[in-house]
Amino acid sequence: MSNKYDLAIQRKKEIVAKYGGKNLSEKLNISHPAVSKWEVIPQLRAYQIASFGYYKLEYIRPDLSF
């Protein structure tokens, strides 16, 4: 990976694959197409996904400082 943003792109793919796009959208109470449009997981959604307990915030978005 060339930088942390590229890593965040890969982490988005990993997390969506683990939860499933449709299931993740239901857990976040948003539409499935909204999840599909993400290049990386938005900061607010990263907080919500971290609250599920499987991934830490820093893992989900390594390109941001929290």
Provide a role label for each language-model segment:
Residues 13-14, 29, 46:
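Exposed boundary/loop context
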Residues 1-23, 55-64:
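A short, Lys/Arg-rich alpha-helix, primarily the initiator
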Residues 43-60:
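DNA major-groove recognition helix of helix-turn-helix/homeodomain DNA-binding modules
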Residues 41, 64-66:
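Short active-site-proximal "capping" loops at secondary-structure junctions
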Residues 23-25, 35, 49:
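Short alpha-helical "recognition helix" segments of helix-turn-helix
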Residues 21, 32, 46:
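Helix-turn-helix DNA-binding elements, focusing on the entry/boundary residues of the two helices
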Residues 28-42:
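Recognition helix of helix-turn-helix/homeodomain-like DNA-binding domains
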